[in-house]
Amino acid sequence: MGKVIGIDLGTTNSCVAVMEGKEPKVIENAEGERTTPSIIAFANGEKLVGQSAKRQAVTNPRNTIYAVKRLIGRNFIDPMVRKDQGIVPYNIVKADNGDAWVEADNNKYSPSQISAFILQKMKETAENYLGDKVTQAVITVPAYFNDAQRQATKDAGKIAGLEVLRIINEPTAAALAYGFEKSASKTIAVYDLGGGTFDVSILEIADGVFEVKSTNGDTFLGGEDFDTRILNHLIDVFKKENGIDLSKDPLALQRLKEAAEKAKKELSSAVTTDINLPYITADSSGPKHLNIKFTRAELEKLVDDLIEKTIEPCRKALQDAGFKASDIQEVILVGGMTRMPKVQEAVKKFFGREPHKGVNPDEVVALGAAIQGGVLNKEVTDILLLDVTPLSLGIETLGGVFTRLIDRNTTIPTKKSQIFSTADDNQHAVTIRVFQGEREMAKDNKLLGQFNLEGIPLAPRGLPQIEVTFDIDANGIVHVSAKDKASGKEQKVTIQASGGLSDAEIEQMVKDAEQNADEDKKRKELIEAKNAADSLVYSTEKTLTEYGDKLSSDDKGAVEEALAALKAVLESEDTALIKEKTESLTAASMKIGEAMHKAQSESQPAAKSATNDEKIVDADFQDVEKK
């Protein structure tokens, strides 16, 4: 079994790590950074990933996709999707299956596809470091992700060419990294406020056993919401001062978003910052500039309710685990937003203790995923991870009631069966509708999927015995079966969201990703060939100017002809032709090299004579000194 990488697929940034010896290590990307922006852009037929995509976002907002994790596994009519539509500059569209997809460069992409592009970048980063192919990964998700979101993340891994050995909850991964090779027994809370999601998990750690007691959270609360508050504040201030509404200008919005994110980060260490955006817009009187002094106090006032929203899940998680705040011995902060002093203050106030700051909030999740990868390929031993399902699972029964089969915070993997019956006389088929959530009526919960069990022997209502079994695997993904006890007829399914990608769609996306990888490779070869050719043209022209008079007219003509031929194809897209002309010029340029060598040889005797004279003078000088 080869190396298993751990990937933190984040809303704002992503990170990849691997076990190196007995320690997990974060791998730097090609730009030398330890995290990569979770941003994809499409520009001039090219796909950009990470920092290169982020750099051009201001000039290409409609084709730059960010924070797609907030859409993954969601239906287009989901209220959270509607909320996002009013914020992001790119188009969110309804897919044929009812899911929320994105549109860029006149193409539609599923959130799983966009996530796959980011995962491919993580995969390449690891392969460049390890010098070997990587095919297996552990990928993290927010603990409060439902089944549809987990399945969509697993699909993203498959599209990226990865076998996803395990989907692991982010707070659990952080706890693994925190408690790795520590022997002390502790009850800890992991408070994870990232770019787009919030989770809190309560765990007990003892002798290498990491047992999650409870988890809670909000999959639509994070740094993006904080940025939006600042952005809206800037729009309001500018409108008040200039009478111009910047919210209708996509280019201005993108600049404002970047400025909001930058100001938020700066105010974690400073108490005031200046936001200066020259030429943000223009009217009949000329260009307009945005200059605003923004303080930490103003920021805290803007986002106070968002921070407060994280406290109720903490309270519920403690209650479900059967603990009081005073029982928690350590609070681990995870996610970039936990650098904000006001967030740290709120955590300290609720738990009654100073939070632990000994882990890097941006990297700890990827490190934990790498440790779990090490466990799965036997590199790491003596660790047992016991996670939980975040939401209750059940089916819809008579009257639209939600009947639970598995309660939230049940340790996984787990299996549970229950006997149900028919609602009508002579009913020969039943529809099993599977839901996930905490509300009492099925319609108020998340419909994960449905299937039919047919061929039930005709009988009065209430007589047939139908055994429904729920099986949740270690990834938190749900498998359901229904069996008629009398006939033995059985129907089994791995629940796929009512939307979700079909197997055929996933396979097509895998092929597209492979094709894109080939195209990317060809593009890279073309760029490298052009760079080499351009460099050769420059050096040849320079040396031809200096030593051209030393060449015979035939040799000089041959070099000039090869030089002109290469310059003529420099702008073409034909890699083979550019390489061919480069080789021709390289061969012709050897004559210049010979001329240079000859010129240098002719000057050497004079140089030697000068050197000998210097030695004689030096010797005479030393003799005089001795006298």
UniProtKB/Swiss-Prot annotation:
<keyword id="KW-0346">Stress response</keyword>
<dbReference type="Pfam" id="PF00012">
    <property type="entry name" value="HSP70"/>
</dbReference>
<keyword id="KW-0597">Phosphoprotein</keyword>
<protein>
    <recommendedName>
        <fullName>Chaperone protein DnaK</fullName>
    </recommendedName>
</protein>
<feature type="region of interest" description="Disordered">
    <location>
        <begin position="593"/>
        <end position="627"/>
    </location>
</feature>
<keyword id="KW-0067">ATP-binding</keyword>
<keyword id="KW-0547">Nucleotide-binding</keyword>
<dbReference type="GO" id="GO:0140662">
    <property type="term" value="F:ATP-dependent protein folding chaperone"/>
</dbReference>
<dbReference type="InterPro" id="IPR029047">
    <property type="entry name" value="HSP70_peptide-bd_sf"/>
</dbReference>
<dbReference type="InterPro" id="IPR029048">
    <property type="entry name" value="HSP70_C_sf"/>
</dbReference>
<dbReference type="InterPro" id="IPR012725">
    <property type="entry name" value="Chaperone_DnaK"/>
</dbReference>
<dbReference type="InterPro" id="IPR013126">
    <property type="entry name" value="Hsp_70_fam"/>
</dbReference>
<dbReference type="InterPro" id="IPR018181">
    <property type="entry name" value="Heat_shock_70_CS"/>
</dbReference>
<feature type="compositionally biased region" description="Basic and acidic residues">
    <location>
        <begin position="611"/>
        <end position="627"/>
    </location>
</feature>
<feature type="modified residue" description="Phosphothreonine; by autocatalysis">
    <location>
        <position position="197"/>
    </location>
</feature>
<comment type="similarity">
    <text>Belongs to the heat shock protein 70 family.</text>
</comment>
<comment type="function">
    <text>Acts as a chaperone.</text>
</comment>
<feature type="compositionally biased region" description="Polar residues">
    <location>
        <begin position="601"/>
        <end position="610"/>
    </location>
</feature>
<dbReference type="GO" id="GO:0051082">
    <property type="term" value="F:unfolded protein binding"/>
</dbReference>
<dbReference type="GO" id="GO:0005524">
    <property type="term" value="F:ATP binding"/>
</dbReference>
<keyword id="KW-0143">Chaperone</keyword>
<dbReference type="InterPro" id="IPR043129">
    <property type="entry name" value="ATPase_NBD"/>
</dbReference>
